[in-house]
Amino acid sequence: MNWQLEFQRCLEKRWLVTMSEARHLVTKELDVARDDLAEAEAGYERGSYKWSTIQSYYAMFHGARALLYSRGYREKSHYCLSVAMRHLFVGKGLLKDILVDDMDDARALREDADYRADFSETGAYHNLEAAKRFIARAIELLRVRKNITSCIAHPRSGFERGRIV
């Protein structure tokens, strides 16, 4: 699939929108992602596989949202959030395709658990492990981006106008 065209379609339909203040919400979204992941782990350990499945997906959702916010966009569709991850991060070699595939699988398992009462220990485990990988990578990417931005803002740190001096 051509993710650039699909990204443009999401923008045209207003399922993705630019939002200048989004960059100020990155930390908040990442905190929500971490909280959801902790809840998913606790639920799994208690045998609450339905809630673990759901919380694991939402951990990934909020992690992806933090990444999207870091680029100045806001999603209005779970599907377009996935499209944005593929276009803005996978297409540039920052995220592996499998991480977004896992997020899409997690969304399907979340929908089954939430709307059809169809869930299992195996599905909960899959979502939980996928969420751990996704959140770890999101944190890495956001930490690197924050450090680069911080260095550009403070030239004495060894960066000037985006280049090492």
Question: PLM ranges: what are they?
Answer:
Residues M1-V165:
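Terminal alpha-helical segments
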